């Protein structure tokens, strides 16, 4: 009982589900954000880095980014034997823009060696029926939508300059559930 955790980590859940370690790989799609480009506001959320949270490798294809990160993991004693990876399209708002852009991003993931699944980061006010249907049809065993839900309180959302409401967040969560998107 000495090493018993009070929670189940993502690592342990993925190991149990896939029978081996699965490593997340950050992928930078060069996405924008309506809270940075003037559509909703300028400057972004109070906590947002001007360069985003990704790797800064947006000028490279997903395949090139994938090779870079797999190479780094191959040299690390902790991850050198990892064979399965989760592609994490992380930086900024990856569902911002037309649905065809999201479809292109998802298509670019197909065929990456060792891809066990994908995760797409976005804002709750940038998903709709069409985009949710695209994500629900993703062909991988794992597919997750990572919604930036910093608060359920409108006063806090306004204070941190999120540019969306708690109702937007609720709508996005319900839409994901309706489509079976985790």
Show which residues each predicted segment covers.
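Amphipathic repeat-derived elements
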Residues: 1-10, 110, 169-182
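Alpha-helical context
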Residues: 3, 21, 42, 81-85, ...
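Short hydrophobic/aromatic-rich motifs at helix boundaries and adjacent loops
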Residues: 38-42, 76-80, 103-107, 144-146, ...
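Conserved non-cysteine loop/helix-boundary elements of the Radical SAM core domain that shape
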Residues: 53-60, 91-104, 118-181
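A contiguous, low-structure linker/loop signature
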Residues: 68, 72-112
